[in-house]
Curated annotation (Swiss-Prot):
The keyword Zinc applies. GO terms for molecular function: DNA binding; DNA-binding transcription factor activity; protein domain specific binding; zinc ion binding. Homodimer. Homooligomer. Interacts with host RB1; this interaction induces dissociation of RB1-E2F1 complex thereby disrupting RB1 activity. Interacts with host EP300; this interaction represses EP300 transcriptional activity. Interacts with protein E2; this interaction inhibits E7 oncogenic activity. Interacts with host TMEM173/STING; this interaction impairs the ability of TMEM173/STING to sense cytosolic DNA and promote the production of type I interferon (IFN-alpha and IFN-beta). This is Protein E7. The gene is E7. A motif (Nuclear export signal) lies at residues 76-84.
Length: 98
């Protein structure tokens, strides 16, 4: 630009089209979906095991007996039903006596 005021002849535009860029990807993808096992699906097929603490009374001396088990929520419900039914827990002191 020359002078104080802008004129159209002072503006130079380079109006050449840009170089074309190939946007195609020519890679071949191998279908390996049959070979792979999805880790998330593998974890869903096995229920999550957790630690559960069971505090109950000895059937012989009524002292507190504490157990820690590792199982699923479904299994701990079954243990609960057994404890409410016929299953009795015996402490180490009373175990030799029975």
């Amino acid at each position: 630009m020359h002078g104080r005021h802008v004129t159209l002849k002072d503006i130079v535009l380079d109006l050449q089209p840009p170089d074309p860029v190939g946007l195609h990807c020519y890679e071949q993808l191998v279908d390996s979906s049959e070979d792979e096992v999805d880790e998330v699906d593998g974890q869903d097929s096995q229920p999550l095991k957790q630690h559960f603490q069971i505090v109950t009374c000895c059937c012989g001396c009524d002292s507190n007996v504490r157990l820690v088990v590792q199982c699923t929520e479904t299994d701990i419900r079954e243990v609960q039903q057994l404890l409410l039914g016929t299953l009795d827990i015996v402490c180490p002191i009373c175990a030799p006596k029975t």
